[in-house]
Amino acid sequence: MTISSTTVKNSYSGNGTLDTFNYTFKIFADADLQVIIRDATATETVKTLTTHYTVTGAGNANGGTIVFTAGNIPTATETVVIRRASPQTQAIDYIANDPFPAESHEEGLDRSMMAIQQLQEEVNRSIKLSRTNTMNSTEFTIGDTDRANKVFGFDSAGELVVTQELGTFR
């Protein structure tokens, strides 16, 4: 099987009655999904497999569905986010002098591609510098106590710094 889609996340609006939502990407096991509910105040809650929802379609290249259990159906003010969350492990073990295991080898390649896609989705949500940027300091070396109640800024050389508060803005 190939991984021909780059989709790793689906989002839907709840309505208080709909309990079934599609995910449109392959997973190998039910536990390879993360289901998050985002409410009207932007609070995110990760739901628990079998407690809050069940999964169908593991192993299907086109995805499947999640079904919320009774009492856990998303309301009209909630957003359902379904993300692939494959384990970041490698479980294939080749045995010396055995015939080449094409199926398990391809599964390993698929799992690697899934991990790459998950990482790319996270990178796509991060703050980035352009490819031609010449900024040298992209790390913060001061600890959390020294960063507390401060803002990101730029020094006279255009380098990233953590600076004092600006007026009454926090």
Label each region the model flagged.
Residues 129-131:
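Function-dense linear segments that define catalytic or interfacial modules
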